[in-house]
Regions:
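Membrane-integral, polyisoprenol-dependent glycosyltransferases
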Residues: 1-165
Length: 165
């Protein structure tokens, strides 16, 4: 049952998130800054001191840059100037957030509720936009949904040693 639903959710997400992912130019100035900082990280080989040109980018999550650099390195190491490889972590994170919402909603709702919640989240214009941008927002959403799922599972299963959460 879950396999069919998750497959359906992934297909729905891809139908919303793939159109334009490879062709639309940078949508936001912060997207360009994330991509440029990740590009500089790959060119310099310095994965600790994250910079946009000469300005440090210490206020943004470092994991975003690392995932973007890994994505570019795996998918198109010779095409550092194209924006689409930098967007793949956001695309995957948006899909993970939607799948996480499905499982989280299944804890509270009857079976069609989880799939409906996932479809509603996947079709929101904000998440569609974030899945198309090389920024940290979709990654942060995925981490929050996963954390919420872990918390509700801990609460529902009465795992006493995790009550400190």
């Amino acid at each position: 049952m879950h396999f069919k639903n998750v497959t359906l959710i992934i297909l729905i997400c891809l139908s919303f998130y793939l159109p334009g992912l490879f062709t639309i130019p940078a949508l936001d100035r912060d997207e360009a800054r994330f991509a440029q900082a990740s590009k500089q990280m790959l060119e310099s080989g310095n994965f600790v001191d994250i910079r946009f040109q000469e300005e440090p980018r210490y206020k943004k999550p470092a994991g975003t840059y690392w995932l973007q650099a890994a994505s570019v390195n795996l998918l198109s190491p010779s095409k550092l100037k194209e924006i689409w490889p930098y967007r793949i972590p956001s695309l995957l994170a948006a899909i993970i957030a939607v799948i996480g919402t499905y499982f989280l909603a299944n804890v509270f709702l009857r079976p069609p509720g989880g799939i409906i919640a996932a479809i509603i989240l996947s079709s929101t214009p904000l998440l569609i936009g974030e899945a198309h941008m090389a920024k940290s927002d979709a990654l942060l959403l995925a981490s929050v949904v996963i954390a919420q799922f872990g918390l509700i599972r801990t609460y529902r299963n009465h795992v006493s040693w995790l009550n400190w959460l």
